[in-house]
UniProtKB/Swiss-Prot annotation:
It comes from Coxiella burnetii (strain CbuK_Q154) (Coxiella burnetii (strain Q154)). This is Large ribosomal subunit protein uL5. Pfam families: Ribosomal_L5, Ribosomal_L5_C. One of its GO terms (cellular component) is ribosome. One of its GO terms (biological process) is translation.
Amino acid sequence: MMELQELYKKTITPALQKEFGFKSVMAVPRLEKITLNMGLGEAVADKKVIERAMDDMIKISGQKPLITYARKSEAGFKIRAGWPIGCKVTLRRDRMYEFLKRLISIAIPRIRDFRGLSPKSFDGRGNYSLGIREQIVFPEIQYDKVDAIRGMDITITTTARTDEEGRALLKAFGFPLKDESR
């Protein structure tokens, strides 16, 4: 469980400090949190969808998700303000590193037709977002017990000030980012 944290403290921190010329160890970018979000538009028709999605999210993250509600009514989507439309989990500290390890080593390689993650998904402040189309890429989800294939958004929030710092941090953790030359 502590493998990625030790890797960060012993090798990544000194390497990034040297690469970017940080004077203090505290200035080196680090992971702040990982947020998993599952938007469930089909929950409008069937309220059980939220419960099943929450069960999947608990298995994936090891933490109970928070239900997200519609902020305002939208006739086009047939939703009203206050209706449950998704769930999210924020992972920090040990659970965050545990999830990141499983994401990098198990889940991402199991994505169909995977050729690397887009380097363009940084937000300008060193945070990275990716979408997963199927929750079954995680080994905790048993394929034969899944009622529906659901995707999720994963946002990795770092303390990096620029995309270059965030990219270097994630590359050091072993994130499979595509080369920008392609």
